[in-house]
């Protein structure tokens, strides 16, 4: 989608939809929001809706960073402690590696 062909109101509406969609456990939408609207929020000449778009982009970045930290923490803990959890670790695993760590 070429954002240059879209009105400023429509840009704001689309940015807001991606921001709200990220709360449905879809942090990828926040990443898309950051990439699509960063230039509009911070590099484009000033216009009325720009401050709101800037807020949505900042909050999307914070939300995405939060999700990355949470997921990285969970993956690290799971990889380290899965064998110690016994049956629960096996139950949570999609594939069970052979052997012992």
Curated annotation (Swiss-Prot):
Keyword Transmembrane helix: yes
Ranges in the topological domain labelled Cytoplasmic: 1-17, 37-57
Subunit structure of this chain's protein: The functional gamma-secretase complex is composed of at least four polypeptides: a presenilin homodimer (PSEN1 or PSEN2), nicastrin (NCSTN), APH1 (APH1A or APH1B) and PSENEN.
Subcellular compartments: Endoplasmic reticulum membrane; Golgi apparatus, Golgi stack membrane; Cell membrane; Membrane
Superkingdom as given in the UniProt entry: Eukaryota
BP-aspect Gene Ontology terms: amyloid precursor protein catabolic process; amyloid precursor protein metabolic process; amyloid-beta formation; membrane protein ectodomain proteolysis; membrane protein intracellular domain proteolysis; Notch receptor processing; Notch signaling pathway; positive regulation of endopeptidase activity
Any one GO molecular-function label of the UniProt entry: endopeptidase activator activity
Keyword DNA-binding: no
Protein task: Essential subunit of the gamma-secretase complex, an endoprotease complex that catalyzes the intramembrane cleavage of integral membrane proteins such as Notch receptors and APP (amyloid-beta precursor protein). The gamma-secretase complex plays a role in Notch and Wnt signaling cascades and regulation of downstream processes via its role in processing key regulatory proteins, and by regulating cytosolic CTNNB1 levels. PSENEN modulates both endoproteolysis of presenilin and gamma-secretase activity.
Keyword tags: Cell membrane, Endoplasmic reticulum, Golgi apparatus, Membrane, Notch signaling pathway, Transmembrane, Transmembrane helix
Intramembrane region positions: 18-36
InterPro entries: Gamma_Secretase_Asp_P_PEN2
Organism of provenance: Mus musculus
Membrane-crossing segments per the record: 58-78
Regions of this protein lying in the Lumenal compartment: 79-101
Membrane topology field: Multi-pass membrane protein
Family: Belongs to the PEN-2 family.
Gene Ontology CC: endoplasmic reticulum; endoplasmic reticulum membrane; gamma-secretase complex; Golgi apparatus; Golgi cisterna membrane; Golgi membrane; membrane; plasma membrane
Protein name: Gamma-secretase subunit PEN-2
